[in-house]
Amino acid sequence: MGCGKLFRVKQRLTRSETPPGIIGTVIRRNRNKNYTEERKMKKDLTELVFVLDRSGSMEHLTGDTIGGFNAVLKEHRNGEGEVLVTTYLFNDTASMIHDRLPAAEVKPMTEKDYCACGCTALMDALGTAIRHIAGIHRYAREEDIPEHTIFVITTDGMENASHSFSAEEVRKMVKHEQEKYGWEFLFLASNIDAVENAEHIGIRRENAVDCCPDAAGTEMLYNAASRAIGNIRGRKNLAGDTSWRNEADRDFHNRGK
């Protein structure tokens, strides 16, 4: 870290029922399943949201982080379907450098975009990103809502600087989107227990991956993320599939401490 039943009609949620920042409607969801029911979404459209740590302790991995991010985008820029990219970089604060840009229009990240410094306000960054994307989906026509929504979260340390969102608030938001809307969250971390920290904010343990805090570990991390994104775009969810993370798991088992 840095410093120190199937709904046939729309159902309005009350503030007490809705996680912070997600006051809207639920449309045709099955409460007994943890993925989105078949509906008139925009097929082959993926909402891809990056929430990337750029706190001070990430400085030695600046080039590797930039390279990993650019490699993921290069792989998913072409092929079937469309990808909309949103990117938040966070330290003490969260900065959005891409706002739902078609992947083909996203320029490669450089050190001008990614400058590591400061503390780790992960809750604020993730809460802000979820609220932004959920708000857009809430007011979109049903047929314009992306078929898949994927969050890729990276960090190398413990939360230590958030003021706007608590871990409990973020947990409610994450679980709401996972269970009601079929969103996928990937939590990729070094220097902390990825599973413990992911579960603390509602992310499923099988979507949490540990990596070594070096160039090879960072490459494994982004390779895993790219495979997961490809699997989600191809088969709709990651339930029961851990193949995307096997290489990263082996590396951490062999070299991690």
Where are these regions (language model features)?
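Cationic, low-complexity basic patches in intrinsically disordered or flexible, solvent-exposed regions
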Residues: 6, 11-12
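Acidic, low-complexity intrinsically disordered regions
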Residues: 15, 20-257
